[in-house]
């Protein structure tokens, strides 16, 4: 077999020998180098994209946490206020006229919070005797807020002291006159007597879910993928999936970051096709260089 191959090579024309040598020592090595470059580039692009995306989705979670912390600070200034504490302690002992004065006082305190934060739709301060001291300017007068809240899943946990505060997922709301398409996130905090620890009621702050568009949507173009925010039970609260053309084409590469504070998850999906486009550009450049080198040889 070896002897036959040797005779075949010896009898081969010089042009053919040069062509085979050219293929073995120039064309094939360059093709292999090009393939290695493309594979390495693909891995580098994915790794760098993941690193950048991890930073960005962590920043989104940080922005969301910052907004929630601001709501918590404003709520704290309300439920620890001595005048409001006194109103809740004596809510069933004062005259009708005093009750109206109390409502005006609470209204002024809470409306300040509503004015300074544009995404707060309204607030409710409810006492244990069922009195609701404040809604917002779009309040409905034909409902009893305490009865509405009694149907909420968090009500018993707050009332029994199982949880001091609750941040709900997205829900529709019927407490407002303009709430036909209103979708809300609610921050709820139980109120206890500062001195005795006795439960006196709760504070509800309703937040327009569009706040998530402002906090997360501005990063959409920078990331080039679909951003989704899931609540602690992994229900979708916000997503850009229906807003981007070509989104979801191909197998997506998925990354996520869970907030220790809220339990919410920010998830990013980047279509694999987007990475392939980048590698394709590198492939064309590599191919051009190889063709040039072959022409030089």
Label every model-predicted segment:
Residues 135-143, 227-231, 235-255:
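GAF sensory domains
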Residues 1-12, 51-52, 168:
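N-terminal sensory and localization modules of signal-transduction and trafficking proteins
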Residues 180-191, 245-257, 264-266:
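A short beta-strand signature within small-molecule sensing/ligand-binding domains used
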Residues 272-297:
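Cytoplasm-proximal transmembrane signaling helix
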Residues 69-105, 126-140:
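Extracellular/periplasmic ligand-binding regions of membrane signal-transduction receptors
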Residues 116, 129-206:
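Extracytoplasmic/periplasmic ligand-binding sensor regions of membrane-associated signaling proteins
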Residues 105-114, 195, 202-244:
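Solvent-exposed, extracytoplasmic
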Residues 14-92:
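Juxtamembrane extracytoplasmic/periplasmic/luminal helical "stalk" adjacent to the first N-terminal
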């Amino acid at each position: 077999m070896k002897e036959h191959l040797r005779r075949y090579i010896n009898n081969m024309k010089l042009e053919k020998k040069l062509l085979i040598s050219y293929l073995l020592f120039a064309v094939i090595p360059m093709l292999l180098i090009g393939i290695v470059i493309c594979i390495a580039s693909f891995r580098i692009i994915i790794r760098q994209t993941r690193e950048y995306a991890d930073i960005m989705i962590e920043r989104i979670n940080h922005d969301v946490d910052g907004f929630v912390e601001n709501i918590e600070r404003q709520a704290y200034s309300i439920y620890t206020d001595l005048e409001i504490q006194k109103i809740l302690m004596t809510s069933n002992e004062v005259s009708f006229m005093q009750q109206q004065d109390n409502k005006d006082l609470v209204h002024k305190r809470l409306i300040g919070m509503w004015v300074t934060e544009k995404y707060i739709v309204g607030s409710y301060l409810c006492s244990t005797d069922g009195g609701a001291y404040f809604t917002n300017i779009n309040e409905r007068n034909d409902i009893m807020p305490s009865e509405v809240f009694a149907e909420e899943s968090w009500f018993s946990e707050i009332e029994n002291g199982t949880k001091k505060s609750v941040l709900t997922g997205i829900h529709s709301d019927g407490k407002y006159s303009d709430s036909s398409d209103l979708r809300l996130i609610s921050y709820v905090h139980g109120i206890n007597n500062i001195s005795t620890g006795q439960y006196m009621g709760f504070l509800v702050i309703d937040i327009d879910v569009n706040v998530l568009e402002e906090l997360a949507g501005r990063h959409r173009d920078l990331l080039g993928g679909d951003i989704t925010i899931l609540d602690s039970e992994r229900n979708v609260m916000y997503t850009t999936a229906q807003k981007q053309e070509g989104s979801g084409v191909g197998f997506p590469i998925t990354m996520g970051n869970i907030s220790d504070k809220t339990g919410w998850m920010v998830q990013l999906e980047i279509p694999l096709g987007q990475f392939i486009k980048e590698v394709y550009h590198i492939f064309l450049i590599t191919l051009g260089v190889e063709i040039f080198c072959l022409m030089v040889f």
